[in-house]
From Swiss-Prot:
Record-listed substrate binding positions: T174, K200, T211, E297, N426, T431
Residues that span the membrane, as ranges: none
Swiss-Prot/TrEMBL keywords: Acyltransferase, Amino-acid biosynthesis, Arginine biosynthesis, Autocatalytic cleavage, Mitochondrion, Multifunctional enzyme, Transferase
Molecular function, one GO term: L-glutamate N-acetyltransferase activity
Claim: Cell cycle is one of the keywords in the record: no
Site (Cleavage): A210, T211
Organism superkingdom: Eukaryota
GO cellular component terms listed in the entry, alphabetical order: mitochondrial matrix
Reaction catalysis annotation: N(2)-acetyl-L-ornithine + L-glutamate = N-acetyl-L-glutamate + L-ornithine; L-glutamate + acetyl-CoA = N-acetyl-L-glutamate + CoA + H(+)
Record protein name field: Arginine biosynthesis bifunctional protein ArgJ, mitochondrial
Compartments (UniProt record): Mitochondrion matrix
The protein's annotated pathway: Amino-acid biosynthesis; L-arginine biosynthesis; L-ornithine and N-acetyl-L-glutamate from L-glutamate and N(2)-acetyl-L-ornithine (cyclic): step 1/1; Amino-acid biosynthesis; L-arginine biosynthesis; N(2)-acetyl-L-ornithine from L-glutamate: step 1/4
Length: 431
């Protein structure tokens, strides 16, 4: 049984340690930290995460499409509109309370967080320079006095080392069993840059961007408009291509800050270097978002759904999403049941252009061994049940679907299985 206390990543679950970095290289000019303020009951569980840049950043974000948008989502959208994504210095996140469906009082609380962060970390103009996020139980007001006090008291303790970044990742966790943090260096031309990203999520995960909370920071000099385009492109192929349970949160937000501290020419949408940066951000986002699936509530498997030879990338993505979100497919995976009829059923009701006599479905093992074909051009194969059982016993596996349209367009989607433990975790969420 996976024991998930509220914000359970203080003790990383056995087997998940390999996903937690022991070191990292982080972007210049940022200080971060994770702290306890009293929003959560247990003092060992951090509930405040802060990131601040020494100099103003260009910023972009993608938000939930749930109509019940949480207060911080509404506040952040207005801030990015009025600032046009320029002059942002700080991101403050509280965990333990979502500040969602909290009325005008919740909006006021989020605004108070912005004002306090601006007072503590400074603003270069009269416009707001801070963004805020919240995650936790919906429908409850923030313990705003504790949060405001925590922002002021803990700001001097923020640092730029690995431990500080890891604590920041811990500070945004709820039912996560491990903190999700990544960093990497990359080159564009003669310049070397660094990007760091952290995210949280294990349940209420489904693409409608964003699918969870997270933020990126880079010392590359990227314009605000270019950052927005690159982040949307990256999110559609990463955070919008994962699902744990099919539920889209009220609080979903991904923010990206670029402070340009590493120097070099500005990267704009028309720069020759822009496609390079966009590809780097997309790959980085994809790897980071997959950690959320690996930590899916009650999950025992990490599953990649690959759809090939569709008429368009959008149609391939929709077919992959439909299969990934099918409860019957997900429970069959948990039961190690090679019931490919459930996969085909989901493909058929995806609403996309599918020709049954051209469709092929296979299990692709991740150990390098040969694939197991289940259906070829609409004709069922004689499935080796023992071989199927071997593949389904693996933690990682791939379901490959070839639509045979001749269009040559592909898409990937990542999901996990549904277990008894998912019901237990969510049945006990508030207790």
């Amino acid at each position: 049984m996976q024991v998930r206390h509220f914000s359970s990543c203080r003790i990383v679950q056995a087997g998940k340690e390999r996903f937690v970095p022991s070191s990292g290289t982080y972007p210049k000019g940022f200080k971060v930290g994770g702290f306890f303020t009293g929003v959560k009951k247990n003092a060992f569980n951090m509930d405040l995460a802060m990131l601040s840049s020494d100099k103003p950043c260009n910023a972009a974000a993608v938000f939930t499409t749930n109509v019940f948008k949480a207060a911080p989502v509404q506040v952040d959208r207005k801030i990015l509109d009025v600032t046009q994504g320029k002059g942002i210095k700080t991101v403050v996140v509280n965990s333990g309370c979502a500040n969602a469906v909290t009325g005008e009082g919740g909006i006021h609380d989020a605004q108070q967080m912005v004002k306090k962060a601006d007072q503590v970390f400074g603003s270069e103009s009269d416009l707001p320079a801070s963004l805020v996020m919240s995650t936790g139980v919906i429908g409850q007001r923030l313990k705003i006095d504790k949060i405001l006090k925590g922002i002021e008291e803990h700001a001097p303790a923020m640092k730029d080392d690995h431990e500080a970044w890891l604590n920041t990742a811990k500070g945004i966790c709820t039912t996560d069993t491990f903190p999700k943090l990544m960093s990497q260096q990359f080159k564009i031309g003669d310049n070397t840059y660094t990007i760091a990203g952290l995210t949280k999520g294990a349940g209420m995960i489904h693409p409608r961007m964003a699918t969870l909370l997270g933020f990126f920071a880079t010392d590359a000099p990227v314009s605000a408009s270019a950052l927005g385009v690159a982040l949307k492109h990256a999110a559609d192929r990463s955070f919008n291509a994962i699902s744990v349970d099919g539920d889209t949160s009220t609080n979903d937000t991904i923010v990206c800050l670029a402070n340009g501290a590493a120097g070099g020419p500005e990267i704009t949408e028309t720069s020759a270097s822009f496609p390079v940066f966009q590809d780097i951000l997309t790959d980085f986002s994809s790897r980071l978002s997959q950690l959320v699936v690996r930590d899916g509530e009650g999950a025992t498997k990490f599953v990649k759904i690959s759809v090939n030879d569709a008429v368009s990338e959008q149609e391939a993505a929709k077919v992959a999403e439909t299969v990934a979100c099918s409860p019957l497919v997900k429970t069959a995976l948990y039961g190690k049941d090679a019931n490919w009829g459930r996969i085909l059923c989901a493909v058929g009701y995806s609403g996309m252009q599918v020709e049954p006599t051209k469709t092929t479905v296979s299990f692709m093992p991740t150990d390098g061994s040969s694939e197991l074909k289940l259906l070829v051009n609409g004709e069922p194969e004689q499935v080796d049940e023992a071989r199927a059982s071997e593949i389904l016993d693996m933690e990682d596996l791939e379901i490959q679907i070839n639509l045979g349209t001749g269009g040559g367009k592909n898409a990937n989607f990542w999901t996990c299985d549904f277990s008894h433990e998912y019901v237990t975790i969510n049945g006990d969420y508030r207790t």
